[in-house]
Swiss-Prot record:
Binding, ATP: 641
Catalytic activity: tRNA(Leu) + L-leucine + ATP = L-leucyl-tRNA(Leu) + AMP + diphosphate
GO molecular function, one term: ATP binding
Catalytic EC class: ligase
Motif ('HIGH' region): 46-56
Protein keywords: Aminoacyl-tRNA synthetase, ATP-binding, Cytoplasm, Ligase, Nucleotide-binding, Protein biosynthesis
Family, similarity comment: Belongs to the class-I aminoacyl-tRNA synthetase family.
Motif mapping: 'KMSKS' region: 638-642
Key word Ubl conjugation present: no
Gene responsible for this protein: leuS
Presence of the UniProt keyword ATP-binding in the record: yes
Name of the protein in question: Leucine--tRNA ligase
Amino acid sequence: MTSAETNAYDPQQVESAAQKYWDATRAFEVDETSDKPKYYCLSMLPYPSGALHMGHVRNYTIGDVISRYKRMTGHNVLQPMGWDAFGLPAENAAIKNKTAPAAWTYKNIEHMRGQFKAMGYAVDWSREFATCRPDYYVHEQRMFTRLMRKGLAYRRNAVVNWDPVDQTVLANEQVIDGRGWRSGALVEKREIPQWFLRITDYAQELLDGLDELDGWPDSVKTMQRNWIGRSEGLEIQFDVRDVDGTALDPLRVFTTRPDTVMGVTFVSIAAEHPLALHAAKNNPELAALLSEMKQGGVSEAELETQEKRGMDTGLRAIHPVTGEKVPVWVANFVLMGYGTGAVMAVPGHDQRDNEVANKYGLPIKQVIALKDPRNDDERTWDGARWQDWYSDKNRAFELVNSAEFDGLDFQGAFEALAERFERKAQGQRRVNYRLRDWGVSRQRYWGCPIPVIYCDKCGAVPVPEEQLPVVLPEDVAFSGTGSPIKTDPEWRKTTCPECGGAAERETDTFDTFMESSWYYARYTSPGARDAVDKRGNYWLPVDQYIGGIEHAILHLMYFRFYHKLLRDARMVDSNEPARNLLCQGMVIAETYYRPNPDGSKDWINPADVEVQRDERGRITGATLIADGQPVVVGGTEKMSKSKNNGVDPQAMVDKYGADTVRLFSMFAAPPEQSLEWNEAGVDGMARFLRRLWAQVQKHAADGAAPALDVAALDANQKALRRKTHETIGKVGDDYGRRHSFNTAIAAVMELMNALAKFEDGSEQGRAVRQEALQAIVLLLNPITPHASHALWQVLGHGETLLEDQPFPQADAGALVRDALTLAVQVNGKLRGTIEVAADAAREQVEALALAEPNAAKFMEGLTVRKIIIVPGKIVNIVAA
């Protein structure tokens, strides 16, 4: 006997039965032959870490709700799933568990696939792939070789974090206080050859395309605009002289503030700049500083916050206007990988340059004065005391101490200097972008091999397409010191495809953002010989993409860029990969800890803590269950391993069932906001589902309901039916237009409360109840599909796929009210209410309002001046 045939709600039994039906009928497999409009709903693919966390549950439940709703509204819906399977965590786990990254990864995929299925997600599993499989990454290898031939992939030296003990490159997050996370060695900055993709060739298109993405959050588009960082300025040439006065290669600097060029008192260059290396040859002190600067991380964020340091190289730059010699300084805040690796320093009008000049006693010149000073501070200038107006080009100012340019404003100075530099071949107008080419090389093992062969005679040669894929060996001994493919001469050895001579393979692997930049397209074309075939143009672009806002810059930028590469390769015909983007909020939870004598904290999982609360539910204290002793309440934070405040979704599913977990994760907060995990709230959702189950069972126990006869309904029956159809209208809008799932659930709960108060056992009373219960089951189906699957059968229907049932539509006739309750105000203050017929004439409404006893009391001795009626809502009597 199934749970649906008894009065007891057994979520495990209900969910198992529904999932077996979906699997047996291949319910969610789709193709391109449907005559329904397509809808592609995609949540960012997961990393197979080994177990689902609550962030996964929230992300994929949002996608599943949208997918099921869209199918019920008549769409051909694709919701696929795969695994972003390469990457550093697998290497770290392999070291810890003394296994190969591949074995660890595939084991995790098997386990997590089972967890996803247990959540009841309506996924087309026939399209599943893991990005670490050769039949997936062969396509990105092929694309890369084509980009090489087009000049869009190239190799140059770039600075990386180098661990001299482990002999490996470290990601920025693996550098902790300047040391390698594993070896503890001081990290060095090292220049090594790396492969890049020319994303900068698409910078303007990536920027312009943001204006077309109406369905993306403004916050994401703003972050991308800032990351692309388009700026207009001048590239100016400074001639350079060596210590002995001989000419060296000139410096070229880009500036958006050529109006300040007369304030240049020194020029800053990166530690890796060729001129810095040249100057250090005969300057041991400078050489030592350059070596020191090569230690530590290379991220832009680190450079912004670290102490500004520098040294005079002894070289001199020739000011392009005055001819004055200004010192060339090496500075730790200038990046070789950004721009030209050199910047003109204007300490009078740039805060960073000002800090350096004041620290080292360098000259500071004022070349800008405000035309509209607002206070004494703005009337005076003091280079030793920075003020924001010194660098504000949006204020009305004029040039001073700038020779023939004195008196010009920003635009006037820009034009005059541009004309001068271009005429004298000392500079030119340039559009510059903050965006840099995408470095795709990683000196790691567990990644897609870069398909390049190195030949002493022919140089870097792309692997011929017929020799692809270059397969990464998976059965390796992995220690974390070096890469197994670097230390395997047999794997490296090959022949040059151009001359047939001895050659070696590239041992770097791709940045894992490569795999996640085009996976969405592969889902559309399983089994295709190329990355995407004609099926891609049926499904693409993605209609709804879902993922965290932390991906706004890197993944979502590369995602857009790669789509343009696919378009230019004539694989897709759209310009952007996704029409709409939903960025879900974090899942947060309370934290608990005990302090240690050394100041560290032992974080305790919420499951191991007993919490005391006041009458309003606020936490007043907490104790460790194991010993009954107090623990410190640390506040709510994002669920994480570091704070040990994660909640195991599997434990919640085992205790409450997947539908309850899904229901809570959609009810507790709007999708874009943070969701605070609260097991009391989960328990509340479980009670709600049990109430629904009991109501349906009780109703069904009385036998089949008669047909609904709208004309025969009494006032109470009409009221319940009106509530049902009001709920249908609201929930449909919440699902479809607003993605406001929490308010949709709240509306269904209100309808449930109305049903609980409806005690009409008559024929039409049961018919109205049947309609309401059927509506509730269908309305909740996108969120609680297992329970809905079972309850639909209890309500007298055969076992079927509810996603193929039409989503309920509100009956406009049911929404019409026979009588209305209107508020009666006297001079804008509420004094009573009246009941009027829906079609009552104005005169009748006015008479009833004037006769309302409490309102009449407040009008004693006053004269009615006018009566204002807001139809269906308010009657306001204005009296004096």
